[in-house]
Amino acid sequence: MKNELYADEIAARRTFAIISHPDAGKTTITEKVLLFGQAIQTAGTVKGRGSNQHAKSDWMEMEKQRGISITTSVMQFPYRQALVNLLDTPGHEDFSEDTYRTLTAVDCCLMVIDAAKGVEDRTRKLMEVTRLRDTPILTFMNKVDRDIRDPMELLDEVESELRIACAPITWPIGCGKLFKGIYHLAKDETYLYQSGQGHTIQAVRVVKGLDNPELDQAVGEDLAAQLREELELVQGASHPFDEQAFLAGELTPIFFGTALGNFGIDHMLDGLVAWAPPPMPRQTDVRVVSAREEKFTGFVFKIQANMDPRHRDRVAFLRVVSGRYEKSMKLRQVRTGKDVVIADALTFMAGDRSHIEEAYAGDIIGLHNHGTIQIGDTFTQGEELKFTGIPNFAPELFRRIRLRDPLKQKQLLKGLVQLSEEGAVQVFRPLANNDLIVGAVGVLQFDVVVARLKSEYNVEALYEPVNVSTARWVECGDAKKLEEFKRKNELNLVLDGGDNLSYIAPSMVNLNLTRERYPDIQFHKTREH
């Protein structure tokens, strides 16, 4: 392997995810980012109800109907001298587990905030997740072409609620109907806005210098005076950009713009490419793996069924941590101990797939999966190690799945097991009867399961309430005590999709009593994959 070439390839990679509250404009930003990366020529503006141009990243049937991104898609595109891997995460709050796992596969996040609303609930939760790994965050204040809150107030709110320092890089001139453009603090340049140009990349008029009389002519004397006043305040009250603090996850650069108007996105992308880290080292159960190591390693963070309705396939998304993937290379699946030849890994452009010849640390590749790969699986060139920190959560909501046609039990079980391997829901099979119980983190997931059982497995099913309020994975070092526990609690015991023993409790009171009664049994709320 040519080391210099390899080092250059890694240095060029930027792998990031977009996090936001639903409706903050994340899917539109994804579209416009791809437009700037020349990955698509005109952006399919999102969710024009009744229009045929659905956004490139919302590609599953149910997403198209609802206009929300339910599953994570992966898109790769070149920008300036970098090669950017963008992971689009579900914006809907029901899909937190999938999003959580996606955030373990990136080196940086872009936080999108609706500037009319400020910090919202979902943004807080996602920020907590990025904190666990001190992920660097860039912030895009979206929708400045609408009436927004005072920009200084927005910065204060981000600092106090999300506990991260703000360094404004760009600043809006006016907002709503009076929105005139953006001033770039580092470059001392003003970019003037033209509305109605959101579908393509337009040439933007630039005014150099804050004291340039041309600025007063372009935006009007009042707004120019207001801008100069605000900037004095901003420079006095906010933090200058500090790259080390950014990389430590302590400071976020702030960009203003409008995704729908396609304005300000390029400034944010320039910042991402300049400051976001190249592929970072990762922790395993035995050592830390550096991206610059020559031997290939990677982990699976997501499984997606039926990305191609014409083929009954499943694809495992794998983050390359080190080394280089080459076509037809032999890799060890550490969990099973088997060596497999990966002849046809995929790269993605949200739903469009193409086979790749090579991939480097930081890239996301797709492996065809016929039921043998699980979330959390590590692949290496023979070394026995396992990447850590890819969680599985105990579900909070439960339903019993019933068949309309009882003869389709076999297809139902197959469909549910495949969906559970994706990590969208968890399936539990009681030891005492033939029921099938599905557990999820959010209500919408049950609708997704029923819709996908019908469209992908031709199984008509419905769900009904079940007397379960919580579940815990069960472990015990003493086989004899575990057997006794199983004998006395059979009615509350189930096996999950991976045949792990779990306890389902009708109430928290029941769970706490059972815990007290069996001090030797461990009840776990999360499991490492």
UniProtKB/Swiss-Prot annotation:
Family of this protein: Belongs to the TRAFAC class translation factor GTPase superfamily. Classic translation factor GTPase family. PrfC subfamily.
InterPro entries: EF-G-like_DII (IPR053905), EFG_III/V (IPR035647), G_TR_CS (IPR031157), P-loop_NTPase (IPR027417), PrfC (IPR004548), RF3_C (IPR032090), RF3_dom_3_sf (IPR038467), RF3_GTP-bd (IPR041732)
Gene Ontology molecular function terms on file: GTP binding; GTPase activity; guanosine tetraphosphate binding; translation release factor activity, codon nonspecific; translation release factor activity, codon specific
Record: residues binding GTP: 20-27, 88-92, 142-145
Gene3D superfamilies: P-loop containing nucleotide triphosphate hydrolases, Peptide chain release factor 3, domain III
Compartment(s) where it occurs, according to its Swiss-Prot or TrEMBL record: Cytoplasm
GO cellular component annotations of the record: cytosol
Residues annotated as domain tr-type G: 11-280
Function: Increases the formation of ribosomal termination complexes and stimulates activities of RF-1 and RF-2. It binds guanine nucleotides and has strong preference for UGA stop codons. It may interact directly with the ribosome. The stimulation of RF-1 and RF-2 is significantly reduced by GTP and GDP, but not by GMP.
Signal peptide bounds: none
Pfam families on file: EF-G_D2, GTP_EFTU, RF3_C
Lineage of the species this protein comes from: Bacteria, Pseudomonadati, Pseudomonadota, Gammaproteobacteria, Enterobacterales
Xref: PANTHER family: PEPTIDE CHAIN RELEASE FACTOR RF3 (PTHR43556:SF2)
HAMAP family according to UniProt: Rel_fac_3 (MF_00072)
Protein species of origin: Sodalis glossinidius (strain morsitans)
SUPFAM superfamilies: EF-G C-terminal domain-like (SSF54980), P-loop containing nucleoside triphosphate hydrolases (SSF52540), Translation proteins (SSF50447)
Protein's name according to its UniProt entry: Peptide chain release factor 3
